[in-house]
A protein has these predicted regions:
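Short amphipathic alpha-helix
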Residues: 7-18, 32
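Nucleotide-sugar-dependent glycosyltransferase catalytic domains
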Residues: 22, 27-184
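Substrate-binding/gating loop at the entrance of the active-site cleft, primarily
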Residues: 1-8, 103
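Alpha-helical hinge/cap motifs
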Residues: 2-5, 15, 94
Length: 184
């Protein structure tokens, strides 16, 4: 995620990995090139339209409250990056993909290509109790149910491109088997 609060916590991990002789390829925007290269990573430009929000303020407000809109945005961004990212992962096959918990494309690419995935969580760790803490209620559940046909249309687009997703939770939630790094 091209944001200081998502990038800065990861730089110490990058420094440690590269100091131990690992190659780290860091996908981000040009604005973060100097930081990731100074930490020892290989900068991989992710300045394509897939990485740019391209949203209005009203769209930004919808992200937290409109699951259908959010799912479409995630699918659009993932599919926009699919060809070049798949080529890059073939040319430079990683042992593992460490992706920001909000960079859903990273998790989806790892799953599609059979690469182990580690979630880098720069906020708090999400688990099965998180929805209760953040205020899921009956109205929210009804909204979720009513949105399912539109969400499923978006998921079909991902499946057509080779992404094995069954539900929106395959995109936005990690299971108990997903390794997670949480920065405190």
């Amino acid at each position: 995620i091209p944001a200081h609060g998502h990038t800065n916590p990861t730089l110490a991990v990058v420094r440690e990995l590269t100091a131990r002789g690992h190659t780290v390829r860091y996908y981000t925007t040009e604005a973060f090139r100097a930081k990731v290269e100074a930490a020892g990573a290989v900068f991989v430009p992710f300045d394509t339209e897939a990485a740019r929000p391209g949203m209005t303020a009203a769209d930004g407000a919808r992200l937290g409250s409109d699951l259908t809109f959010s799912t479409k945005l995630i699918v659009d961004r993932t599919l926009a990056a699919d060809d070049w990212l798949s080529r890059d992962l073939t040319v430079h096959p990683p042992d593992v993909i460490v992706g920001d918990s909000m960079a859903f494309w990273a998790k989806l690419a790892a799953k599609k290509h059979g690469i182990p995935f580690v979630s880098s969580t720069t906020t708090f760790a999400f688990n099965r109790f998180s929805a209760k803490v953040i205020g899921q209620n009956g109205a929210g559940f009804l909204q979720f149910l009513l949105a399912q046909p539109r969400i499923n249309r978006q998921l079909k687009r991902l499946r057509a491109a080779g992404y094995a997703v069954k539900s929106v939770f395959d995109i936005i939630a990690n299971d108990n088997e997903t390794e997670t790094v949480v920065y405190t």
